[in-house]
């Protein structure tokens, strides 16, 4: 049994991971970890993740108190908490799966470096189809990126905290790399005012409304035609 800690158990992904782990014959939940000051700290993991029953697994606000009991940490929390989790995972030499978004390029490098010393998976989006889409974006950019205008439109529910989304940023980084530039030098988030579109830029548009599931569309606009590559979640 792989002893597992879930960081950010109250979020959508945290609840889902808890359910999957509880149903799994290979995973054993040993603790949940939430941000300091949350009213659910001290409660049972099964209750706060809406499983409707106790699991006999505590939710704490200090990972260092429970980390020695685990084999792997699964983190879908916040940028600030994610960096704390990373440092503790390195210190205690624990495997880490991180799907938290919002990190800048320097912070992402910290995860890459950690992968040299501990088992590490960092992904802004763990969907198989999103990763297929990323491959398609690389192919499209190599073929037509320099002769088209590129725009990224992403849509999420009203509770999404970061914009553009981590997945959208990752897509932009792949495109920028294929074009031989940096996303930080080419990204334009939204548009306002007057003036023509600057060549070589990558536009971003973030929509937040209701309970809308994750949606990402990348448009390559030419003259007389355009290509759209999209991924839409249904839940």
Model regions: which residues?
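A conserved short beta-strand
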Residues: 31, 96-97
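N-terminal Rossmann-like NAD(P) cofactor-binding module of classical short-chain dehydrogenase/reductase
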Residues: 73-74
């Amino acid at each position: 049994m792989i002893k597992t800690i879930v960081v950010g158990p109250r979020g959508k992904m945290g609840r889902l991971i808890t359910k999957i782990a509880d149903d799994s014959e290979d995973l054993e939940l040993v603790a949940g970890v939430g941000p300091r000051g949350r009213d659910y700290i001290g409660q049972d993991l099964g209750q706060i993740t809406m499983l409707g029953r106790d699991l006999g697994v505590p939710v704490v606000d200090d990972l260092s108190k429970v980390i020695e009991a685990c084999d792997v940490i699964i983190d879908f929390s916040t940028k600030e908490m994610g960096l704390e989790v990373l440092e503790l995972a390195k210190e205690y030499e624990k495997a880490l799966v991180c799907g938290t978004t919002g990190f800048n390029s320097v912070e992402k490098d910290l995860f890459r470096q950690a992968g040299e010393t501990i088992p590490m998976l960092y992904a802004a989006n763990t969907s198989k189809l999103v990763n297929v889409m990323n491959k398609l974006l690389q192919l499209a950019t190599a073929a037509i990126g320099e002769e088209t205008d590129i725009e990224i439109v992403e849509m999420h529910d009203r509770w999404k905290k970061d914009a553009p989304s981590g997945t959208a940023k990752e897509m932009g980084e792949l495109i920028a790399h294929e074009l031989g530039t940096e996303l930080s030098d080419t990204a334009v988030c939204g548009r306002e005012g007057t003036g023509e579109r600057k060549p070589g830029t990558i536009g971003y548009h973030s929509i937040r409304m209701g309970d809308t599931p994750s949606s990402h569309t990348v448009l390559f606009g030419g003259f007389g035609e355009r290509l759209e590559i999209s991924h839409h979640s249904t839940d």
